[in-house]
């Protein structure tokens, strides 16, 4: 279609604004429909098309109604009245992203695909689900909550109910929720938008439908569409099917600001207690309400302050809290939250005696005062801004570009400033640099104004309680007993009949889908050249990278003994947290931030195609600007060869940081831990993965005492010598500039010749006729189960059938059994 001009009307949508978006090589168009709906197109040549519907959803209680609607709107609609069109569609889609998410004050539905027909299918099904959902009682009971008469007093089931039994009881989630609830007590942020299990069971089907009517009107909807799209086709579809006869409605107002908050408040919350937990397992966090989240400069300012103060243990505030000795680590919730109307800044301790809460507050405030007095430092600021420029320049593929744009745009758009107000990052970086040039103490002044002199703050203590889960279960059981009546069994039979009734094949056939003929037949090869540089194998790929070099150093560790292998996860963490030669840990941290857009160290292992020969690899992944390549590679060689890995103080910091990450992730990633543990008895590669990142690794870390640090440091230095041998190295590199190859030759020349020992590590694998069950206790009312079976070799033709079987289980019979009927919150069949 011809490019529209401001004032043009297409399908009752009037074009209100056109904006060039140089950062995305795009043009932006903002349309407003007569019904009040706004649509923003970000048009460019990107074939990965993306869309996202956004509704302002303001909770008024802890029932999680917005979360339940997020699940259930996608479970049957006027055009597609099947049980689960979302999953049925996924069976024949090549989407690169498909999801829905509930935030504290909004709900987002989003998807992307590189195929135009697939994109159209996704948009078609999503639009019908959102504007014409069936909202059946059975869907509410399946996705939300239902009472089951089990003959033992009754119990509750439902997908969201079960999900929140896990996540709402997570210690760190209680910390973050406690801060928001206490800072904004008379607003929607005082409630849990995801739902609290105790309150979820109070939600009725009628209240659920009422919430939909109040929050899903067209005037309360914003739609972002990104990529190489047909604007007229999309606008015509929306108007013809859903908006043509819709009355004009205004968007719901932005959440009101709190007026009843108490200055310098102190609150205390309880959380589940782990078996064997101690009094010092509490969290104490200080949280502030700062500036509105609808201004890009304010968001970038606070984001940069978080990076400067808390990015790693060498940063001044992070270091000050660790040096205080009050706790094992800082709280993982430390940082900023920009998803509320006012941004919040949180910082505090985890693993602290709650009786020391006042002392914790004094340490935090005194540390901030000292930082402002001494200054953050020009080098730190320049390094942080350079990293921000790198991220803005980089072409990433980890998430769709449309999702990145949405995450920026939504701040200003939802507060009435339009979709472009907070969409671009480059102009805001320019503005921030100008502000710093005008005021060399720009960040210190912000801290003094918005933190030290700001009494809209709260000190939150979260204390583990061994009765927490018991009392929660007791209250839920009491509510179940009180709600049971003579009609409950009949309600259960009605629900089961609905679940047992298969979708009519003729109705299923109405769902749009892809055929094999819709898929491109051409396979784009991942082309690279195999070379040798400084006697090291090099996999070289030359392509446009926007002026960035990418280098992966792969170090063969297949011959490492178990004593050398187990410490590698800690080694990886310690490498970037310690000093090197005349550089202390802070100087190393700043050099990494200044020279590299990314510097990651990971360990992995893999079998050959038949699953027989195990190879372990220690990877160093680097990304840097081409103009910095010589300095970056020289520094990388210096760090890998000369990092001070025997420093007991840095070992303590790295160990605490790593243990904190394990403890924080165990509930959220419990299914992954279970799968990894169960898989570890089948192949050497899986057993190595368990050693490095599973329960075996956790037990090894938990067993390290402070008296072990000296011996551990010696072991780390021995590992360093083993790793840094040229005979172990393989390099992968990608750049638009062939001069990188010469730079790599100089880089590799720093490494001494040498090769492997013959030892290796033992493996204990399951015999073909053997079965094994293992159970671990968690502080949760939710169970996480993984079952792993032996399969044919990768080269066996049965693997093709097995791949298809995994997809069928994930979207078919097994999904229906455990999710649709059983109310499980997750099911992830797959093969390795």
What residue ranges belong to the model's regions?
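Catalytic Zn2+-binding segment of zinc metalloproteases
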Residues: 72-82, 578-583
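Active-site His/Glu-centered metal-binding helix of metallohydrolases
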Residues: 65, 69-73, 571
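Hydrophobic, small-residue-rich alpha-helical packing segments that form membrane-like cores
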Residues: 146-220, 224-242, 246-273, 278-280, ...
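His/Glu-based metal-binding/catalytic segments typifying zinc-dependent metallopeptidases
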Residues: 42-45, 52-54, 161, 165, ...
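M16 family metallopeptidases and their MPP-like homologs
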Residues: 47-58, 84-132, 139-147, 173-198, ...
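Non-catalytic terminal extensions that flank enzyme cores
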Residues: 1-50
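C-terminal regions of mature proteins
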Residues: 2-4, 227, 384-542, 669-767, ...
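Short beta-strand/turn micro-motifs at beta-sheet edges
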Residues: 39-42, 96-99, 210-212, 271-275, ...
């Amino acid at each position: 279609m011809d490019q529209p001009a401001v004032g043009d009307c297409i399908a009752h949508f009037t074009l209100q604004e056109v904006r060039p978006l140089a950062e995305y090589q795009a043009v932006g168009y903002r349309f407003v429909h007569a019904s009040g709906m706004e649509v923003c197109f970000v048009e460019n040549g990107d074939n990965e098309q993306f869309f996202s519907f956004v509704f302002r959803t303001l909770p008024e209680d802890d029932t999680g109604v917005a979360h339940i609607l997020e699940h259930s709107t996608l479970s049957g609609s006027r055009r597609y009245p099947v049980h689960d069109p979302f999953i049925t569609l996924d069976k024949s889609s090549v989407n690169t992203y498909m999801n829905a998410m509930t935030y504290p004050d909004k709900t987002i539905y989003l998807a992307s695909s590189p195929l135009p027909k697939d994109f159209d299918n996704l948009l078609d099904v999503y639009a019908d689900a959102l504007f014409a959902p069936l909202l059946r009682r059975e869907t509410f009971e399946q996705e939300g909550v239902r009472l089951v008469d089990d003959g033992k007093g009754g119990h509750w089931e439902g997908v969201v109910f079960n999900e929140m039994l896990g996540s709402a009881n997570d210690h760190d989630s209680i910390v973050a929720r406690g801060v928001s609830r206490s800072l904004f007590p008379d607003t929607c942020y005082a409630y849990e938008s995801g739902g609290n299990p105790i309150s979820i069971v109070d939600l009725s089907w009628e209240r659920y439908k009422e919430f939909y009517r109040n929050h899903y009107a067209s005037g309360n909807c914003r739609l972002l569409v990104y990529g190489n799209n047909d604007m007229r086709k999309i606008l015509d579809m929306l108007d013809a099917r859903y908006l043509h006869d819709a009355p004009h409605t205004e968007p719901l107002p932005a959440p009101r600001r709190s007026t009843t908050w108490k200055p310098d408040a102190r609150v205390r919350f309880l959380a589940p207690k782990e078996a064997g937990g101690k009094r010092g397992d509490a969290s104490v966090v200080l949280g502030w309400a700062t500036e509105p989240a609808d201004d890009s400069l304010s968001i970038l300012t606070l984001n940069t302050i978080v990076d400067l103060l808390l990015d790693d243990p060498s940063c001044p505030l992070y270091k000050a809290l660790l040096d205080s000795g009050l706790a094992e680590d800082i709280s993982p919730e430390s940082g900023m939250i920009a998803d509320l109307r006012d941004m919040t800044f949180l910082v505090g301790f985890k693993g602290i005696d709650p009786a020391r809460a006042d002392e914790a507050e004094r340490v935090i405030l005194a540390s901030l005062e000292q930082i402002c007095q001494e200054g953050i430092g020009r080098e730190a600021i320049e390094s942080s801004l350079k990293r921000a420029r790198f991220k803005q320049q980089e072409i990433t593929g980890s998430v769709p570009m449309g999702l990145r744009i949405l995450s920026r745009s939504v701040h200003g758009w939802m507060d009435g400033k339009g979709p472009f107000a907070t969409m671009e990052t480059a102009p805001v970086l320019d503005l921030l640099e100008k502000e710093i040039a005008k005021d060399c103490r720009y960040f210190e002044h912000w801290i003094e104004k918005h933190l030290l002199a700001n009494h809209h703050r709260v000190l939150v203590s979260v204390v583990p309680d061994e009765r927490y889960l018991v009392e929660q279960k007791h209250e839920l059981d009491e509510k179940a007993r009180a709600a049971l009546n003579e009609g409950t069994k009949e309600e259960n039979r009605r629900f089961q009949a609905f679940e047992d009734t298969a979708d009519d094949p003729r109705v299923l056939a109405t769902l749009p889908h892809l055929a094999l003929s819709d898929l491109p037949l051409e396979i784009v090869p991942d082309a690279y050249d195999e070379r040798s540089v400084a006697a090291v194998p090099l996999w070289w790929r030359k392509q446009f990278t926007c002026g960035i070099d990418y280098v992966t150093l792969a170090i063969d560790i297949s011959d490492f003994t178990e004593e050398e292998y187990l410490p590698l996860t800690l080694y990886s963490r310690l490498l970037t947290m310690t000093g090197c030669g005349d550089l202390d840990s802070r100087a190393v941290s700043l050099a990494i931030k200044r020279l590299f857009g990314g510097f990651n160290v990971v360990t992995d292992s893999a079998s050959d195609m038949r699953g027989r020969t195990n190879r372990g690899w220690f990877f160093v992944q680097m990304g840097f600007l081409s103009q910095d390549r010589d300095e970056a590679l020289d520094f990388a060689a210096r760090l890998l060869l000369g990092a001070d890995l025997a420093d007991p103080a840095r070992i303590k910091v790295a160990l605490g940081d790593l243990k904190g990450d394990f403890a924080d992730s165990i509930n959220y990633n419990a299914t992954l831990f279970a799968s990894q543990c169960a898989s570890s008895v089948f192949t050497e590669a899986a057993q190595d993965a368990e050693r490095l990142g599973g329960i075996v690794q956790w037990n090894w870390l938990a067993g390290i005492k402070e008296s072990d640090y000296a011996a551990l440091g010696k072991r780390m230095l021995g590992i360093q010598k083993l790793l840094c041998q040229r005979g172990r190295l393989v390099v992968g590199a990608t750049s638009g500039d062939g001069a990188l190859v010469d730079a790599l030759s100089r880089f590799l020349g720093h490494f001494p010749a040498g090769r492997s020992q013959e030892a290796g590590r033992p493996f204990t694998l399951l015999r073909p006729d053997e079965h094994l069950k293992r159970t671990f206790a968690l502080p949760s009312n939710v169970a996480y189960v993984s079952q792993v079976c032996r399969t044919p070799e990768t080269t066996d033709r049965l693997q093709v059938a097995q791949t298809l079987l995994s997809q069928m289980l994930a979207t078919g019979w097994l999904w229906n059994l455990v999710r649709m009927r059983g109310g499980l919150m997750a099911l992830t069949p797959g093969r390795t």
